[in-house]
């Protein structure tokens, strides 16, 4: 039986111990801050990137990993005896990373199945972790691909932003439907679905977020949850408030983590994401 390994990109928000335990390969994106290039993997310390972004003269710019880095990553895995690679990446609505991964696989001439997770952050983690667990347990490539697709189809990702400034400056506002770019200081909740950010609600103050969540939980209370996660940019207080509200409906552990530099660049400070995988 061959060896299958899972590759993903650093837009994933995941506990470091899981990466190690499941032997997941994470290819880093890059962030340019005031003409200095940082590897996303070097910005994982809590609050580090946000402090750099707040002090920068202009909005940081993210860039996908070079094609050559993907090619090198895949070649190195094959040299170690890996027979199949499954690469799971963030939505093309947010980055061209998936295309760089495909091109890297072609250059390396290695057996790579490149998948669009449809998401990013911890919603992508749901797929990556399950795939890695299955690979370790000796599942076949087809079994892993089927499981990843099933998880993707049952996952929902909701993003709340406190300012649209980063989305506007980063050129992502065109992919956010139903929002006037002039309303920069409005609170907005969006869903990432079918590689598009779609506005659900907008308003003033954090009550916009809590009211949306209460309504969402009530409407979906009949649906059994497999796992749920919350990510945040900046202070954790809002994320912890949301966690308390979710706990009334879901009595299992809820992962609350700071999102990485790639997502924070797009969302700005004060943002959060609620990600749910249903049974």
Swiss-Prot record:
Residues 4-278 form the DegV domain. Gene3D superfamilies: 3.30.1180.10, 3.40.50.10170. Transmembrane segments: none annotated. GO terms for molecular function: lipid binding. Signal peptide: none annotated. The keyword Cell division does not apply. InterPro entries: DegV (IPR003797), DegV_C (IPR043168), DegV_domain_contain (IPR050270). Hexadecanoate binds at residues 62, 95. Keywords: Lipid-binding. May bind long-chain fatty acids, such as palmitate, and may play a role in lipid transport or fatty acid metabolism. This is DegV domain-containing protein SpyM3_1149. It comes from Streptococcus pyogenes serotype M3 (strain ATCC BAA-595 / MGAS315).
């Amino acid at each position: 039986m061959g060896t299958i390994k899972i590759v993903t990109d650093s837009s994933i928000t995941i506990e470091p111990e899981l990466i190690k335990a499941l032997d997941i390969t994470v290819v880093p994106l890059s962030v340019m801050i005031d003409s200095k290039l940082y590897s996303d993997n070097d910005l994982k310390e809590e609050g580090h990137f946000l402090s750099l972004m707040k002090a920068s003269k202009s909005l940081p710019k993210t860039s996908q990993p070079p094609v050559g880095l993907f090619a090198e990553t895949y070649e190195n895995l094959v040299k170690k005896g890996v027979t199949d690679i499954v690469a799971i990446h963030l939505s093309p609505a947010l980055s061209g990373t998936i295309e760089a991964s495909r091109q890297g696989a072609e250059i390396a001439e290695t057996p790579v199945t490149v998948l669009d997770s449809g998401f990013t952050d911890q919603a992508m983690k749901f797929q990556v972790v399950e795939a890695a667990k299955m690979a370790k347990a000796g599942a076949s490539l087809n079994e892993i691909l089927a499981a990843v697709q099933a998880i993707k189809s049952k996952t929902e990702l909701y993003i709340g932003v406190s300012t649209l400034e980063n989305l506007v400056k980063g050129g992502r506002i065109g992919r956010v439907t139903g929002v006037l770019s002039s309303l920069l200081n409005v609170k907005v909740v969006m869903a990432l679905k079918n590689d598009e950010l779609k506005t659900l609600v907008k308003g003033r103050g954090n009550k916009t977020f809590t009211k949306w969540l209460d309504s969402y939980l009530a409407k979906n209370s009949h649906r059994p949850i497999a796992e749920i996660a919350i990510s945040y940019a900046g202070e954790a207080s809002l994320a912890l408030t949301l966690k308390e509200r979710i706990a009334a409906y879901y009595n299992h552990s809820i992962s609350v983590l700071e999102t990485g530099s790639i997502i924070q660049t797009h969302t700005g400070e004060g943002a959060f994401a609620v990600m749910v995988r249903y049974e």
